[in-house]
Structure formats: structure tokens, C-alpha cells
Design a protein with these regions (language model features):
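Non-catalytic substrate-recognition/targeting regions of SAM-dependent transferases
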Residues: 53-55, 82-148, 156
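Conserved alpha-helix/loop element of class I SAM-dependent methyltransferases that forms part
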Residues: 149-165
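S-adenosyl-L-methionine
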Residues: 195-238
């Protein structure tokens, strides 16, 4: 990663953005090393004019996932686009990322299934590490990558509490919490989600970490309806 310097080609705003990235890298450095954290949010609209989230995924290579928060209508669209281009260029420069390892999306306010709608069909997955587990992420085909970075602490708690318990994961998405439960010694895991796509992804995550078999069930169903149908039939020690 490049050292902080003043770049005369940067606008004042771009230089502020660059300075903030450098500051955040310094601030996070020890925490990342101490926690063996490879995937993290580096920047989250710290400067209002540069309303983007910058997530870093480190494995054999480094990938950067930038999401622009959709600008309000009163913001000049041309200026917003110019600032976005600056943010992308500065991020690439500081993190030394080639163009093909940076992915850019616009995050609009969405509800229901729209937030999980497929954006592309490249089908390119990459393996990243978190908490001693491996997870497949996809930077191009969906708005989210398959691993919610802000759930890291919750996943770790699941792993710590799972030993000897039957674990139920509702709205399981790509099954990252299930992987933690299995790694933590859960007697069994049941992952329920309506999406076959995400359940298949969850299954691949489980296989990637060496888990499978009858004790690890993947159930495609509406979670609330599934709960009603199975009420009283099975008691889970961790949900």
C-alpha cells in the first residue's frame, strides 16, 4: 500500500478522501493483525461528499468492493459522478489494486427480494478467510458479496456457543453462521432459506470447510411457514 503523500493532480476533495483512507488504514492496522482479520470495511461515507463504502477482501489476492450510496435528488448528478470517479481512482492507487480486482456498485434503498436480485451472470467466486473458516464470495453478480462483514462478531458468538447443541439458522443466506456453528462443535445444523441459489451457496461453503452429511441439513422453505409446520417437533439449543 502506498504511503500518504500530497498528490498535486488530486482535487482538494480527492486529497481529503485519500488522507482519510490512509488514516483509517493506520487506525485499523493493529486491530486487523491482532484479530487475524482479512475482510473488513475500510471506509463508510466518513466524508459526506464521498458517500461510498469501501470493503477490502484479502486472500491470495486483494479485492476491493466499493458501493456508492445513491445521491439524493438535490445533489448535482455530474458532481456526484466526478466524486465517485475520484474515489475509485484514489482507492485503487492507495491499495494498489488493478482494475479487474475492484468492483463498483450503487446501493439504492430496496426492500424484499429486490435487495437479493441477481445483477450479473459471471459466476466467478473467490475464497476468503474469516475466523479460521473459508467462505466463497461473489463480487459481480449480486449487490452483496455473500459475506456480511458487519456480522463478524455475531458469527463468532455462534461458534463459541454451538458446542454440543443443535443449531437452527433461519434466513440462512449463504450459511456463514452455519459454518461457524459446525466448526464450533454443533451436534447438528439446520439452515432454512427460500432461495435455492443461496442454499446451494451455503452447501458449497460447508463443503469448503469439510462439513456435510445428514447432521447438516439445508432446507429450502419459507422460514415462518417452516416454523409453523415444525412447531414442537424439534428443540434447538441455539437459534
Amino acid at each position: 500500500m502506498t504511503a500518504p503523500t500530497h498528490n498535486p493532480t488530486h482535487s482538494d476533495g480527492a486529497q481529503m478522501f485519500a488522507n482519510r483512507l490512509h488514516k483509517n488504514l493506520r487506525h485499523l492496522g493493529r486491530w486487523l493483525k491482532r484479530g487475524h482479520i482479512h475482510c473488513y470495511r475500510l471506509y463508510d461515507a466518513d466524508i459526506p461528499e464521498y458517500a461510498v463504502a469501501v470493503d477490502v477482501y484479502q486472500s491470495e489476492q486483494r479485492w476491493v468492493h466499493i458501493q456508492e450510496y445513491e445521491a439524493p435528488r438535490h445533489v448535482d448528478a455530474g458532481k456526484a459522478q466526478a466524486r465517485l470517479r475520484e474515489a475509485v481512482a484514489v482507492t485503487r492507487q492507495i491499495l494498489e489494486i488493478p482494475e479487474q480486482q475492484l468492483f463498483l456498485k450503487v446501493r439504492r434503498q430496496q426492500k424484499g427480494k429486490a435487495q437479493y436480485r441477481k445483477l450479473g451472470a459471471r459466476g466467478q467466486f473467490h475464497s476468503v478467510q474469516e475466523g479460521g473458516n473459508r467462505f466463497l464470495v461473489n463480487f459481480s453478480d449480486y449487490l452483496d458479496t455473500g459475506l456480511f462483514l458487519d456480522h463478524r462478531i455475531t458469527r463468532a458468538m455462534v461458534g463459541q456457543l454451538a458446542a454440543g447443541r443443535d443449531f437452527l439458522n433461519l434466513f440462512a443466506y449463504t450459511g456463514s453462521a452455519t459454518v461457524y456453528a459446525a466448526r464450533g462443535g454443533a451436534t447438528s445444523t439446520t439452515s432454512v432459506d427460500m432461495s435455492k441459489t443461496y442454499l446451494d451457496w451455503a452447501g458449497r461453503n460447508m463443503e469448503l470447510n469439510g462439513f456435510g452429511g445428514r447432521e447438516h441439513r439445508l432446507v429450502q422453505a419459507n422460514c415462518l411457514e417452516w416454523l409453523e409446520r415444525h412447531a414442537g417437533q424439534h428443540h434447538f439449543g441455539l437459534i
